From Swiss-Prot:
Organism: Pseudoalteromonas translucida (strain TAC 125)
Catalytic activity annotation: thymidine + ATP = dTMP + ADP + H(+)
Record-linked InterPro entries: P-loop_NTPase, Thymidine_kinase
Cellular component terms per the entry's GO annotation: cytosol
GO molecular function: ATP binding; thymidine kinase activity; zinc ion binding
UniProt-recorded name of the protein: Thymidine kinase
Subcellular location: Cytoplasm
Length: 194
């Protein structure tokens, strides 16, 4: 029975690596996965999913206007698809999350989504908000703060390395602008404590 999975974490927990390993596992068994990634994240090139450890795969891209159900239905008609793997799923819209529930419920294809839970302001991304509400399975992937605690927040820094709490929710960047930290160090960096 197909299900909708949401694998979430702070940055640098291995979400893309886990997605690419899942794709490999399906392919090794002669099965066909569909890989999707957000058009906005072109750090590795448009239509590419890549991990920090050097793994990479081609992917179909989605933006806020893409009907992901129609895309997957069309691909499935051309060739049987055995799963859908979505990288950077925090950038999905509410409608796209609902379309992914239709992929599971109507097409019977498992959907595995990988992404950030919350942004640098400590607020949920739209895609993450609706995946938390609609996914059959929620799986937290863990990474570590510099103090050794579980990191569950993401700090954005300015050009001087100082933590900032203002700005657009989406700004594509890597380790030079973001740091995964625990709640205690997130609050301390933004002077949110008592």
């Amino acid at each position: 029975m197909a299900q909708l999975y949401f694998y979430y974490s702070a940055m640098n927990a291995g979400k893309s690596t886990t997605l690419l390993q899942s794709a490999f596992n399906y392919q090794e068994r002669g099965m066909e996965p569909v890989i999707l990634t957000a058009a906005i994240d072109d750090r590795a090139g448009v239509g590419k999913v890549s991990s920090r450890i050097g793994l990479q795969a081609d992917a179909h891209i989605f933006d806020e206007n893409k009907d992901v159900f129609a895309l997957i239905q069309s691909l499935n008609q051309d060739k049987k698809r055995h799963c859908v793997l979505v990288d950077e799923c925090q950038f999905l819209s509410k409608e796209q999350v609902m379309q992914l529930t239709d992929v599971v419920d109507e097409l019977g294809i498992p959907v595995l989504c990988y992404g950030l839970r919350n942004d640098f302001r400590g607020e949920l991304f739209t895609g993450s908000q609706y995946l938390l509400a609609w996914a059959d399975k929620l799986v937290e992937l863990k990474t570590v703060c510099h103090c050794g605690r579980k990191a569950n927040h993401v700090l954005r820094t300015d050009e001087n390395g100082d933590a900032i709490a203002d700005g657009n929710q989406v700004e594509i960047g890597g380790n030079n602008r973001y740091e995964s930290v625990c709640r205690k160090h997130y609050k301390a960096a933004l002077n949110m404590g008592r």
